[in-house]
Structures are given as C-alpha cells and as structure tokens.
A protein has these predicted regions:
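Short catalytic/metal-binding and nucleic-acid-binding patches
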Residues: 1-161
Length: 161
C-alpha cells in the first residue's frame, strides 16, 4: 500500500469489513446533521416537534420508501439533529404489492449507501427549494455549508433481539 500524504487525508471506513451492503438484510442506520445542529425541530413535552425542515425530511422519508420497492422501512425516528432508520433490503425476486394490492416488479436491491446518498441529496434539494419559495434569508446548503455529516452510522441487525 502506498503512503500517499502519509495517510494524513485518509478516512477510515466504519463499515463492517467483508460485508456486502447490497446484500439483503435488516440495517439500523443513523444520519446526523453537520455539527449536530438542530435543523429538524425540537423536543417539547417529550415529543418531537418538527419545524419546516423537519417536515421536509419526514415527507422525503415517506417518498423515498414509496419509490424504492427494494427497500422496506420498518421504523424511523426523526430527532432534532439526527434520524434513525430500521431498513430491510429485500431479497431479489420478492413479490411486492402496490397500494391496490397488485403485484409489481422491483429492481434488484442497490446498496444501503446508494439509498443514503440519494436521500441526503433529495432532502437538500427540497430544503433549498423551500428556502427559495419562502424567500427566507438563510444560506442554502452546499459543501461550505453542509446539512449532513459525512457518511452514516450503521448496524447490521442479525436477529430479532
């Protein structure tokens, strides 16, 4: 292995070594805001109270799993500065039914990281659209002003416990 930059810029992966994240299974995923800033709302009377960005995040979660038939959302929780998902990546050739109980085909599962990057991107795009539409004087999210922390935290759920 080459010692480019003396490993100064190397970021260690927190993924499970030798695990294929495109394999079917159950995954517990956590996405965190950059700087752990409370972008999504606040806790009041032991309940999460979404702000406008939190509502956008909630809508995008629902939409993401409506369009991604290869994934099944078991549970999710939006907190002020992070989101927890319990996601099942379906086996190939599983029959899925639409809202009218009609069987539909779905594409072979992609990886969990594909879902995470797509979800993060769609949230940023929707939030930026909201900033424009509401004519709010706050900076849009970009590389210099990120909404999300890099990467995500995951646990592979290996049993029902």
């Amino acid at each position: 292995m080459n010692d480019y930059y003396k490993n100064k810029y190397r970021i260690e992966s927190n993924r499970l070594k030798d695990w294929n994240y495109a394999d079917f299974g159950c995954y517990y995923i956590t996405l965190v805001t950059h700087g752990r800033i409370n972008y999504f709302g606040k806790i009041g009377n032991d309940k999460m109270i979404y702000n406008d960005i939190g509502n956008i995040v909630n809508e995008e979660i629902i939409k993401s799993f409506d369009i991604r038939k290869e994934l099944r959302l078991k549970e999710y929780v939006i907190m002020p500065n992070h989101i927890h998902f319990l996601i099942i990546l379906r086996k190939d050739k599983v029959i899925v039914y639409d809202k009218n109980n009609v069987p539909v085909l779905f594409r072979k599962p992609k990886s969990i990281s594909t879902f995470v990057s797509s979800f993060k991107s769609s949230v940023i795009n929707k939030v930026d659209d909201w900033i424009d539409e509401a004519n709010i004087d706050i900076p849009k999210f970009d590389r210099k002003n990120p909404l999300w922390q890099r990467n995500y935290y995951d646990h592979i759920v290996r049993d029902d416990k």
